Amino acid sequence: MTHQTHAYHMVNPSPWPLTGALSALLMTSGLIMWFHFNSVALLTLGLTTNMLTMYQWWRDVIRESTFQGHHTPNVQKGLRYGMILFIISEVLFFTGFFWAFYHSSLAPTPELGGCWPPTGIHPLNPLEVPLLNTSVLLASGVSITWAHHSLMEGNRNHMLQALFITIALGVYFTLLQASEYYEAPFTISDGVYGSTFFVATGFHGLHVIIGSTFLIVCFFRQLKFHFTSSHHFGFEAAAWYWHFVDVVWLFLYVSIYWWGS
């Protein structure tokens, strides 16, 4: 490798953007095939290609940052800006769902019975499973902060314990949400209430699964001593993402479960 006189990471040629684009094409085409012809072969191929691409691409990023030293302070600064912009884009994504919910609920049409929840809809009790879910996510926010502070203080064992607790709470939240969906007295096809409820809470649930996966990767990386108190952006990004998921849930709980019921 030639000597470089700047602090920026000039990435090497990589096949993963190409395989990632191909997997996206296979997944979207596979979804159409599944919807119209009830065949999951193409979708399965797309998902497999996507998983392999993500694994190998992020493996390369870890190699470049942890073992090759390409992630200098300037590069980390750029990654931080990138993560902040990504979270802002996610905030706008969820803003659309809240807009749809409030647009429908603040001025219910005659077709809905002129009331909210619409006539015939029996909403979930906000003081049962949704309240438990809220406390679970708030507790996970505390434990991820404990993990971050432990890492900053160089206390590896406490960091691993706190991270494991956070992951366990994330998995517990997902199971509670799945049971709530299974027992819900309405479906996604029950008018605007069902569609806004399931799309907003469903996308939040997907983000919890993504965040839990992010934290599991951080847990295994910490087992291999990848993070130090001064070099741990991978974990920091996961913590930021988890706090974002927390805050979105609080808005969902207050808007859709509590006020909307």
From Swiss-Prot:
- What GO molecular function terms would the record report? cytochrome-c oxidase activity
Entry keyword annotation includes Translocase: yes
What's the catalysed reaction? 4 Fe(II)-[cytochrome c] + O2 + 8 H(+)(in) = 4 Fe(III)-[cytochrome c] + 2 H2O + 4 H(+)(out)
This protein's GO CC annotations:
mitochondrial inner membrane; respiratory chain complex IV
Identify the Pfam families for this entry.
COX3 (PF00510)
Give its E.C. classification number: 7.1.1.9
A single Gene Ontology biological process assigned to it is: respiratory chain complex IV assembly
Q: Identify the residue ranges that face the Mitochondrial matrix compartment according to the record.
A: 1-15, 67-72, 153-155, 224-232
Name the predominant localization: mitochondrion
Key word Transmembrane present in the record? yes
Stretches that traverse the bilayer: 16-34, 41-66, 73-105, 129-152, 156-183, 191-223, 233-256
Q: How does it sit in the membrane?
A: Multi-pass membrane protein
Q: Which residues lie on this side of the membrane: Mitochondrial intermembrane?
A: 35-40, 106-128, 184-190, 257-261
User: Which keywords does this Swiss-Prot/TrEMBL entry list?
Assistant: Membrane, Mitochondrion, Mitochondrion inner membrane, Translocase, Transmembrane, Transmembrane helix
Protein family: Belongs to the cytochrome c oxidase subunit 3 family.
Function, as annotated, reads: Component of the cytochrome c oxidase, the last enzyme in the mitochondrial electron transport chain which drives oxidative phosphorylation. The respiratory chain contains 3 multisubunit complexes succinate dehydrogenase (complex II, CII), ubiquinol-cytochrome c oxidoreductase (cytochrome b-c1 complex, complex III, CIII) and cytochrome c oxidase (complex IV, CIV), that cooperate to transfer electrons derived from NADH and succinate to molecular oxygen, creating an electrochemical gradient over the inner membrane that drives transmembrane transport and the ATP synthase.
Q: Could you give the subunit structure recorded for this chain? A: Component of the cytochrome c oxidase (complex IV, CIV), a multisubunit enzyme composed of 14 subunits. The complex is composed of a catalytic core of 3 subunits MT-CO1, MT-CO2 and MT-CO3, encoded in the mitochondrial DNA, and 11 supernumerary subunits COX4I, COX5A, COX5B, COX6A, COX6B, COX6C, COX7A, COX7B, COX7C, COX8 and NDUFA4, which are encoded in the nuclear genome.
Q: What's the protein here called?
A: Cytochrome c oxidase subunit 3
